[in-house]
Amino acid sequence: FDFHGPSIEEAKKRANEKGLTNLEFFVSDAGEIPKNDYDLACIFDAWHDMGDPVGIAASIKETLSKDGTFMVVEPMALDGYANNIANNPASAMMYGFGTLVCVPASKAQSVGLGLGPQAGPSKLMELLSEAGFGNVNLAAETTNNLVLQARG
């Protein structure tokens, strides 16, 4: 699911070229995904751009099976501005991107939280909990990304 039609068309084309038949791609707003007992839902480097990340996560929770997992991959960030600047070499660049691209995109949408790409793991996990997930953890961390897992 993606709201960007050209991306969905490209995904369909590539899947067809590779002979993959067990995949489906749909143009859809994240808040309008049909309930279908999915085992896994993922958002890659985009949750912070969404105007209502809590509402979208809650909507995704409703699409998951009882044991389903929501995986959120976000840009690497540490908790706390000073800590992030001091210990995350990419943070200054990411704050710049966030100021010019991510936050304005979020603010232009419904709710307009303006999370930005440097929220840090604690804030991201807090928002997933607000969305109704009972089991939220930082599953992996690389120099470029945080990977969060939300279940139940």
What do these predicted regions represent?
Residues H4-P6:
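Conserved SAM/SAH-binding beta-strand->alpha-helix loop
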Residues S28-A41:
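A short acidic, Gly/Pro-enriched loop at the edge of an enzyme's catalytic core
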Residues V54-D67:
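A short glycine-rich, Lys/Arg-flanked "PGG" loop and its adjoining helix->strand segment in the class I
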Residues V73-A131, N137:
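C-terminal alpha-helical "lid/dimerization" subdomain adjacent to the S-adenosyl-L-methionine
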